Amino acid sequence: MSAITPPKITTFDSKPTDVYFFGTCVLDLFMPEAGMDAITLIEQQGIRVHYPMAQSCCGQPAYSSGHPTEAFDVAKAQLDLFPENWPIVVPSGSCGGMMKHHWPTLFKNTEYESKAVDCASRIIEFTHFLLAIGYKPEDKGEPVKVADAMLAQGIV
């Protein structure tokens, strides 16, 4: 049995001053307060958060359901939302995985390929972003249980 290689954790030479936050369609529709809490936590670290208001969906639901054309159309609308070379923080392993690993393939050999590859290179899942900037949580009392999202393992 071979050993499992742990994921490479993203690091920054210095803490970013600005990030984009891709809120995901599910978070926006069902748990917007969790998205706002994540944004607040990033801002408390002295980082400006930019939330492009035109964002909608990464295309993952359509892509995972076998509808790449629909995924292409939905994801294409997101590509122009992140023009600055800032990290794109995503609070979802599945959405982050779609953007980081599948966007380059989805847009391969199209006019959108370079933008997709650029965006993919800047994707970082929210909890991995906190680790990368050296976030240390305060002790607020009773401990909570945290489940490590297996889908997030490949997007760090």
Language-model features, listed with the residues they occupy:
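Iron-sulfur cluster-binding electron-transfer modules in prokaryotic oxidoreductases
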Residues: 1-156
